[in-house]
Amino acid sequence: MTGGEVADARVCEIARQQLKLGQRVSSLNTEKGPQLGSVKFVGIVNGFKGIWVGVDWDSGQGRHNGVVDGVRYFDTVGEKSGSFVRPHTLSTGVSLLDALTSKYRASSNRKDEPDEEMYVLSTGKKRQTKVPVLLVGKKQVEDRQGQLGILRLAALTYAGVCCAGPAGHIRDVAPSIEELDLTGNLLPDWHEVKRICDELPALRILELSCSRFPFAAAAKPLLVSSNLTGVALNHCGLTWSQVDILKHYLPNIQDLSLIGNCISNFKDGNEDAGGFVQGLQTLRLLNLDDNYLEDWQEVMKLSKLPSLAKLCLNGNRLTLVEYLARSGDRNSTSLPFVSLLCLYLGRNNLADWSSVDALDWFPSLQDVRLSDNPLTDHKTGTATRFMLIARMGSLSCLNGSLIKPRERRDSEIRYVRHVLQTMRTQSKERIIKSHPRFEKLRMIHDLPEDIWSSGYINTANSDSFANNFFAVTIECVAAGVGECASITKKLPLATTIGKLKVVCESLFKLPSNQQRLYFKDQDSPIPIELKDDLETLADVGIGPGRIIILDEI
């Protein structure tokens, strides 16, 4: 071995002592934002001088898969998530105490001077200059934050935290922290997380998103913390078999956020995929947004969690919602999802009305999100808000908007009329099968039983229906018409939207083919467009005293 080779070997050994395989590191080059990764190789690369570190980057933005010139040096998660860098371009992190002191005490020790990053531009005629902004009360806030002993909420995102630091130091300096955000840091494993939790006796909420932790079931499970009630592990590349171990790590967890992971099923790693999820007895909120769930039968494996009140499934790949218990006592504690109050299903692939009808069977459901599904698409979908409200009788909130009693009543009446209008020639059995709540709504709103005749809808009284007049107010906001007063007009319930356009043409001289009509409901913040010329005023739920808005295309 030559002298140069001996020197390289010594340097390589020193580098290996400083950088261990699996260690979390961050790039000191921040031009592209924070870059985190795991060390997969430390040593010499054939054909290149010096010591190199092979890093598998979390972002996937590397140069190769660990193979250079036909030689594999390390394995990567992605096809091009690996690259070689020099050791001096990497940071191995700081202790939690150092990060806290650097952020909070440093800010409180600054002089009361304008913030360099906050300014406004002057309005001078010759040239603009930067006028510094001084925040009123900023010094007081920073002074209070600088008192680490009373700090309750600490945010250390991408601060390079890799360890708790010497035992007892954090507890002495910042014992009151209740919420800690460690998103995008360099903690290597759950043992280090446990040390942090042990140092912070008041800690209840912990954000660990954008981390990479090994999960391994041990003979004696690691108790990370019995005090933590809320944990976020968003964008950590987790599968459910890893998450399932958390019930041993965090026995009293109530809120668990797992957004943007790799969860496609609820197989726990020990049992077959056919079993229900066990444990997690205290879990109330589970956020699984932006994962890879496709089969509703997988979601049903969560249905025995006794305390689960809110389940977020936005941005998955679900095509159908089902509920197994369609009969019996809805108050039974043995029913699936017995405690579930909120279910968010936005941005999925739900396209069938049976999914909406299934939601009506959930025993406690009050809040549902169905936006951005094929069924509810405002251009191609068939589900409007009034239909969704009518088909789910227990809801008090839909797509983030409260359902007031007036809106529910009007939606249900409008829905019944819509069914009567569109299914005149259908049998009673066919209608009830397609619209499970129709008969119940008919009774709630006191529609006469003689609407059925020989198993079909009785239209014998359609003439009296057509002659049922009421007054509506038409407001014209079309720019081409100019300013004009609103007009109140008496119209029969059987007036179609197409005929209403003819009426508006005679009143405001705006051709019907250039009109766009809206129905203004006091319980809806946004006017509802009247698109179907064949629908009647009764079908769309327009009654006495309502307002029609006329605009131009």
PLM regions and their residue ranges:
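Short acidic, glycine-rich loop/turn motifs
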Residues: 27-31, 57-59, 476-480, 552
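Short, solvent-exposed loop/turn segments that connect beta-strands within catalytic domains
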Residues: 31-33, 46-49, 480-483, 524
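Long, contiguous C-terminal flanking segments immediately downstream of a protein's structured core
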Residues: 2-6, 14, 20-22, 78, ...
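Short secondary-structure capping/turn segments at boundaries of alpha-helices and beta-strands
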Residues: 39-43, 140-143
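Basic/aromatic-rich interaction segments and small domains that mediate binding to polyanionic partners
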Residues: 28-30, 41-79
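Short coil-to-beta transition motif at edge beta-strands of beta-rich domains
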Residues: 14-36
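Short beta-strand segments
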Residues: 35-38, 72, 485-487
